[in-house]
Amino acid sequence: MVKLALVVIFLLLASLFQPLTAQSSCPGNKKETWPELIGVPAKFAREIIQKENSKLTNVPSVLNGSPVTKDFRCERVRLFVNVLDFVVQIPRVG
């Protein structure tokens, strides 16, 4: 019975910490992903993203496979591109 109580307490505590560690969206952002931009040149993709959401001030191009930080930022969308500067992954806020 004590083990069951400990398991229940652990699960309750774990559920409290989950919202603190996993942020999936930003308040006020209407659109957070752009799957339609795969295969589009990065310059045009950047213009479309910033036109659709003016809060996104940081839209860098990143060569696909390059290391990036894991921090979540509501004002950033990374454009993962190939060597020809075409978008190869779905752009998303973060």
Swiss-Prot record:
User: One Pfam family this chain carries?
Assistant: potato_inhibit
**Would the keyword Acyltransferase turn up in this protein's UniProt record?**
no
Q: Which SUPFAM superfamilies match?
A: CI-2 family of serine protease inhibitors
Disulphide linkage map: C26-C74
Q: Where in the cell is it found?
A: Vacuole; Secreted
Instruction: List the InterPro entries.
Output: Prot_inh_pot1, Prot_inh_pot1_sf
Secretion signal span: 1-22
- Principal location listed in the UniProt entry: other
In its UniProt record, a GO molecular function of this protein is: serine-type endopeptidase inhibitor activity
Keyword flag Signal: yes
Q: Where is this site: Reactive bond?
A: K70, D71
Keyword annotations of the record: Disulfide bond, Protease inhibitor, Secreted, Serine protease inhibitor, Signal, Vacuole
GO annotations under biological process? response to wounding
Q: In which tissues is it expressed?
A: Mesophyll protoplasts and to a much lesser extent, roots and germinating seeds.
Provide a GO CC annotation, any one. Answer: extracellular region
What's the domain of life for this entry?
Eukaryota
Q: Which PANTHER family match?
A: OS08G0441300 PROTEIN, PROTEIN, PUTATIVE, EXPRESSED-RELATED
Instruction: Give the protein's function.
Output: Stress response. Inhibits trypsin. May play a role in the reentering of protoplasts into the cell cycle.
Q: Which family does it belong to?
A: Belongs to the protease inhibitor I13 (potato type I serine protease inhibitor) family.
> What is the protein's given name?
Trypsin inhibitor 1
Tell me the classification of the organism that encodes this protein.
Eukaryota, Viridiplantae, Streptophyta, Embryophyta, Tracheophyta
